[in-house]
Amino acid sequence: MLEGEAYLEDCLRIDAFGKLDVIPAGRVPETHLELLASPEFSELVDLLKSRYDRVVIDLAPVQAVSDAIVVGKHADSAIYVIKSDSTPLPVVRRGIDRLQEVGINVAGAVISQVDLNKISSYGGDY
């Protein structure tokens, strides 16, 4: 879509309940970072913000590539996702600091892939 090969309406996928629209990444070109930094991407984000209550962009880890830094500048806020039992606290702190250093508002964090057997005593009857 950012390369001019498709229209937004052609890329949208709607869930079975009609409550969630998704734009899959599709083919990721070698120049994907240039596309994410392009005026076309900025215009796409602005268009999506005008059409939807929430726009969520799922990106690679901030430590791995610069995608989150480039795209995060278009976001009102970021949610930092931490893989349970995998991501050391110093790495989490560096990642959050890196986002904040470039002016990205980190609204919070989510811990993913939690092994509920390890925390069976927590939460009671939830």
Residue ranges, per PLM feature:
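P-loop NTP-binding module
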Residues: 1-126
